[in-house]
Design a protein with these regions (language model features):
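SAM-dependent methyltransferases
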Residues: 1-60, 72-83, 89-201
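Short His-Asn-centered micro-motif
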Residues: 62-66
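Short glycine-rich, flexible loops that bind phosphorylated cofactors or substrates
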Residues: 68-70
Length: 201
């Protein structure tokens, strides 16, 4: 996540869960003026505040109805490749639902919060359900070499296309080969270089 997560709280009934989550995530608690007495950041207009956070790329955990979050960010939704995580949590902590940015941190965020609250996250992205991993969100130590091909790769995998994994002798990259699709000069049946080992320290 690019910036500190904002935990959004509209009223006193949601405050205990919101406070618990913000402490657990070391995140800022954003509370509505006049309804919440303790917060790191106060706001008066909920819709305007949500829209601004979303536009600024800040992950949002809203301890409120999903509809509030959806209406708040609706006009700011433009590119799924860059949208921040948006997660809804029921006021009583009984449900955790990643709404947007599932493969940009929302699913992982929902899992962490769910573990804290002792509930199961309501994750709906097909890759996570079928394979237990976000195909465009590699495990730690890897980066995605060609994100532009994720959609076609995912669709093929979900359709049951056979998969073969190959690596160079140094294991510096992993090539995920799907069926007979080719890339480049066609000398290899590589669908694309899905993951490569990150050179980051």
């Amino acid at each position: 996540m690019s910036q500190s997560t904002a935990v959004f709280c509209l009223g006193v009934s949601a405050f205990p869960v919101a406070k618990k989550i913000s402490a657990f995530l070391d995140a800022e608690l954003h509370g509505k003026t006049g309804r919440v007495s303790q917060a790191d950041v106060f706001f008066s207009d909920a819709m305007e505040h949500l829209s601004k956070l979303f536009q600024d790329g800040i992950p949002i955990v809203g301890v409120c109805a999903s509809a509030v979050l959806i209406r708040g960010v609706a006009k700011s939704i433009s590119d799924k490749k860059t949208e921040p995580a948006l997660v809804a949590v029921a006021e009583d902590g009984s449900a955790v639902v990643p709404l947007l940015g599932g493969h940009h941190g929302a699913n992982d965020l929902a899992r962490k919060i769910s573990e804290l609250l002792g509930v199961d996250p309501a994750i709906t992205t097909s890759g996570d359900i079928r394979f237990g991993i976000s195909l465009d969100e590699p495990p730690e130590g890897f980066v995605l070499a060609n994100p532009e091909d994720v959609k076609e790769f995912s669709v093929s995998m979900l359709a049951g296309e056979s998969l073969m994994i190959s690596s160079d002798e140094n294991h510096s990259c992993l090539d995920y080969v799907l069926g007979n699709k080719t890339l480049g000069n066609g000398s290899k049946q590589i669908f694309y270089n899905w993951l490569k080992v990150s050179n980051l320290p």
